[in-house]
Each structure stands twice: as structure tokens, then as C-alpha cells.
Amino acid sequence: MNYLHLLMLFETIFVIGSFYALKKDILAPSFLAGCSFWLSALCVLLNESKWNVHLLKKTLLILVFGQIAMFLGDILATKVPVLRKKDKETIEKEKSMEYKPIFIQNGKNLFLFTFNTALFVYFAYSILKKGFYMNAIIDAHRMQVEDGISEMNVFVQQSFRFLIVCALVYAFILLYNRIICNKKYQHDMFYSLYFNALAIIESVLSASRRNIIVMLIAWFFMTVVLWNVKNGWQFKLSKKLIRKTGVIVVITMVIFRALHTILKGTQSNLTSFYDYVTYYIGCPIQSLNIYLQRNVQIHRSPYWGQFSLPSLMKALKRIPRSVETTFDYVYLGGGANAASNVYTFFLAPYLDFGFMGCMIFSFVVYFVLSLLYTKAVKNRNMTYSVARNTAILGFIYWITLNSFYFCPVMFVFAPTGLISVICFWILFVFLFRIRFN
């Protein structure tokens, strides 16, 4: 029996079923995760002969039941009642709410412009002080661990996170004025693009593509939420949005392909764009499969959360700093001549908590994500608190579309993730001293 074909069949049924079960909400966490797994399974199927793929029954069961657990957590969260009900006066007030454009005082814009520019220059200097050559950037990549650029100055590390927060908050302002108020302001465009460009350049200089993915998914999330608000949460998936999303995905993959060539060289046969895209998207499932082939008897991690929540556990001193919390590379097999060290969302909790623990972990993560989305953002008018929630949730929503790749929870539920959320709160207070409604 070909378990890979069964996986592809399951992914197709799962995507269609979750789409309708979750009322055609394209932002439903388990639906987005299902789409990413469907695409990953397709890329493995396209390379079945080349990679000599023989999917294990165990791999199939982990992927199938893991996604079912995600879906159950998602759909259960939609059934949780709202704890604080609105009175009639509040409901009527929100129905008649008139949205006005957001204007940020020039002094605040200039302060953040100067502050972030100065920190960016210092960051770039820290990377390139040995000379402007690619080895300096590669060295920066080697300095990274699961929690970021750990060996750099602490102030430099946190400034990077604050810059990303600024980039996303100004992206929200740009999208809000454009979508909700149908207004185009040059200063919105300038500051939003400037802060986002700085954040992307810093990501490239630190040899990390992760933050670029975080920002792109946040832009996508905020755009869809604002379109829903404008249309009374009666949003329908349009061909225009699909086309734009497709173009952005292609451009992103081209950029990632270029970064892969620059930073990792060309010691593989991933010479074509097609090979790279199918490798990048499909390798996690094959890596998981190979890991399970080589490790028939799985022994649970000696430390709770060693692989799924390493940064948090180390910060709480539940895991010694010297304990290894990352995975080694494995070759994909066959004629791939390529390696991977990403194993989908499920391997980390599987090693930490066993099969049932992995299912519970997946259920809880997607229950929390869905609860935050459905209760703090969905079907709400764009008040100050909802705007803040949208920006923060956009920042962590990359968990959904990256679940096919690895376990992003380790980065979100980490000290740096908490610092970033605090930065969102501080920046919203700084920019919007009074609520806009």
C-alpha cells in the first residue's frame, strides 16, 4: 500500500472539509495549516521517485492524527462562549461606528525613524565590522541559536525585535487607511516601506529568512482581517486576492532561492527553481519519514519541552544551557543530493511527549490560536483593542502556515516572543494615546 498516496488523499479531504466545517473562513488556523501540509505532501509526491520516498505507516498516522488534533482544537475554540457580553448601547454604537483615517504625529514618526535608523546602523556595523563580505553574514548565521542572535550585544538583539514590531504596526496603519478608509497617504507608504525594508535587510544580514516569513504572513493576516471588517465580516475569497498572494509567494521563493545560493552554496543538485521550491516545501515530511525510519524505538526527551519549548524551558532553568535542543541534518535520499533539518510541526512534541502527548500539544496550540482569533479579532469592529490584537496576532500567526515546516511554537512561546508582544503594547500606547473609534 502506498501511504504517500493515502496522505495526499487525506490532505485533500482535510483542506476541503475544514474549509466548510469552519464556515469558509480562510484565516481559520487549522485550515491554513492544512493548506500548507497539502502543498508539502504534493511536493513530496512530485519527488517520490527522485527522493526514493517510501512513506511509513507511522509517519502517515502522526501527520493524519496530528492535523485532526489541530482541527478539533480549532473548532472547539469557536464553540467557546464570549465571557463578557456587550450591552445594547455598545452594540448599537459599534453598528453606527464611523471609521476615520489614522494620523500619527510627525514628532512620533521622526522619533521612531531616527531611533530605528540608528539601531539599524549599529546592527549592520556589528555584522560587517570585519569587512563587507559574505563570510561576515555567514558568521552571523552561525551565531544563531533557537532564540535568535544570541552571541550579539543584548541591546542589538532586542532592537531587531522592536524594528520588526514597528514595521508591522506601520504596515497595519497603511493597510487600515487604504482598505477601511480608502485613503492613500504618502507618509504612510514611506514609513511603512522604510521600516519593513530595514527589517528585511537586517534579516538578510543575520542570514535568517524566518523573520521575512513572519512579516509576510502578518501582512496577509492583517489584510484579510481589514477586508473582512470593511465588508461586515462577509468576506469572500476573490480571484484578485489569490493572484496577488500567488505573485507574492513566487517573489518570496525567488528571494529565498537567491539567499540559499549565497549563504549555503551550490553543493547540491537544486539547480532549477522548480527543484528548490519542491525541496523547500516538501523536505519536512520526507525528513520526518527518514527520522522515523532510522529511529524505530523512540525514547522520550529527558527534559520536558526540550525540543518543542527549548527557549522557554531554558529561561525557566528547567533545561541546562548545555543540552542540545536542535536536530541534525538528514539526506532526503535517492538522487536528491540535498539535506534537511526540519521535520514538520510534529517531531518536536512527539519526542518530548510521545504520540498522545504530541496530539494533545497540537490540540492545545491550535485551540489557543483559534480562541485568540475568534474572540479577540473575528466579527469585531476595528476599535483600538481590536487593532492592537490584530497586529499582535498577525505577528504570531505564522505558526499556522509554517506548521508543515517545523514547530514555530518554540519561537513564539519564548522570552523574545514575550518581549515582542510587550513592544506591541508599548508602541500602540505611544502612537495612540486615545482610542480611535
Predicted segments with their positions:
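N-terminal "leader" segments that precede or initiate the main folded domain
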Residues: 1-102, 106, 189-199, 215-259, ...
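Alpha-helical transmembrane segments of integral membrane proteins, especially early/N-terminal helices
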Residues: 19-37, 73, 114-130, 174-183, ...
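Hydrophobic alpha-helical segments
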Residues: 341-437
